[in-house]
Swiss-Prot record:
<dbReference type="Pfam" id="PF03134">
    <property type="entry name" value="TB2_DP1_HVA22"/>
</dbReference>
<dbReference type="GO" id="GO:0036268">
    <property type="term" value="P:swimming"/>
</dbReference>
<dbReference type="GO" id="GO:0008017">
    <property type="term" value="F:microtubule binding"/>
</dbReference>
<keyword id="KW-0256">Endoplasmic reticulum</keyword>
<dbReference type="GO" id="GO:0051301">
    <property type="term" value="P:cell division"/>
</dbReference>
<dbReference type="GO" id="GO:0005789">
    <property type="term" value="C:endoplasmic reticulum membrane"/>
</dbReference>
<keyword id="KW-0131">Cell cycle</keyword>
<dbReference type="InterPro" id="IPR004345">
    <property type="entry name" value="TB2_DP1_HVA22"/>
</dbReference>
<keyword id="KW-0472">Membrane</keyword>
<comment type="similarity">
    <text>Belongs to the DP1 family.</text>
</comment>
<dbReference type="GO" id="GO:0006998">
    <property type="term" value="P:nuclear envelope organization"/>
</dbReference>
<keyword id="KW-1133">Transmembrane helix</keyword>
<keyword id="KW-0812">Transmembrane</keyword>
<dbReference type="GO" id="GO:0005783">
    <property type="term" value="C:endoplasmic reticulum"/>
</dbReference>
<feature type="compositionally biased region" description="Basic and acidic residues">
    <location>
        <begin position="191"/>
        <end position="202"/>
    </location>
</feature>
<feature type="region of interest" description="Disordered">
    <location>
        <begin position="177"/>
        <end position="261"/>
    </location>
</feature>
<feature type="transmembrane region" description="Helical">
    <location>
        <begin position="35"/>
        <end position="55"/>
    </location>
</feature>
Length: 261
């Protein structure tokens, strides 16, 4: 554990911070020799960090692993050994020169494929989002339809007739509630044009007519409107005639006989 902490501190200070400041000085002074030196160092150090990622996983158990790593970083950076310049000129530069075209083609293919994969992933994401929105809309529509079906006409007709239904205006909530009859409430009022005598005459004449037809063996037929009115008028006239005929006659006084002389 102590070796790991010390090695990380050495790598950060001598491998990153000091070379970064030296590169800044080279750029500021425009010293081409120092500029080339630190460019070679950064190329070698980038490869070192890539290899270190795997070696820390697989061979970190090796004895004196962290000590070897610290010594390697110091060897790369030391102005006496110039390990970074040596590795670059002997190994890295010849290898990159041979594989440069292949590396460039791989980079171009990676750019194209990454763009295509990004577009495909975006399309798939949009399709998934659209399908999810459609499913949510259909589920919401189904729930709304079920809610509306619960308020069907059959449910409204099943309400008791005695209980009044109050209607409140949404625009004026403070207004008094309106009392209205429920939908489908049976109306018991008759037409205003029919009087009580006409309704009585219709019912009475219909009963007498049906009784007469059943006695005579004829099927009963309902009276029409005009017939009922005529019957009522005739009945009124017959009543008047009967009252006139049944008026009691006054008794004649017997004539007094004159006394005989």
């Amino acid at each position: 554990m102590v070796s790991w902490i010390i090695s990380r501190a050495v790598v950060l200070v001598f491998g990153l911070l000091y070379p970064a400041y030296a590169s800044y000085k080279a750029v500021k002074t425009k010293n081409v020799r120092e500029y080339v030196r630190w460019m070679m160092y950064w190329i070698v150090f980038a490869l070192f960090m890539t290899v270190e990622t795997f070696t820390d996983i697989f061979i970190a158990w090796f004895p004196f692993y962290y000590e070897i790593k610290m010594a390697f970083v110091v060897w790369l950076l030391s102005p006496y050994t110039r390990g970074a310049s040596l590795l670059y000129r002997k190994c890295i530069h010849p290898t990159l020169s041979l594989k440069e075209k292949e590396i460039d083609s791989y980079i171009i293919q990676a750019k194209e494929r990454s763009y295509e994969s990004f577009v495909n992933i975006g399309r798939k994401g949009l399709n998934i989002a659209a399908s999810a929105a459609v499913q949510a809309a259909t589920k919401g529509q189904g729930a709304l339809v079920g809610r509306l079906r619960s308020f069907s006409m059959q449910d409204l007709r099943a309400l008791p007739d005695d209980t009044p239904i109050h209607y409140r205006d949404a625009l004026y909530p403070d207004a008094p509630e309106l009392h209205r009859r429920p939908i489908g409430y049976p109306t018991t009022s008759h037409a205003d044009s029919d009087s009580m005598d006409e309704r009585w005459s219709d019912s009475e004449m219909a009963e007498t007519r049906t009784a007469a037809r059943t006695r005579g063996g004829m099927p009963s037929k309902p009276l029409q409107r005009s017939q009922s009115l005529r019957v009522s008028k005739k009945k009124g006239l017959s009543r008047e005639v009967s009252t006139k005929t049944t008026k009691p006659k006054g008794k004649k006084k017997p004539a007094q006989s004159e006394p005989e002389n």
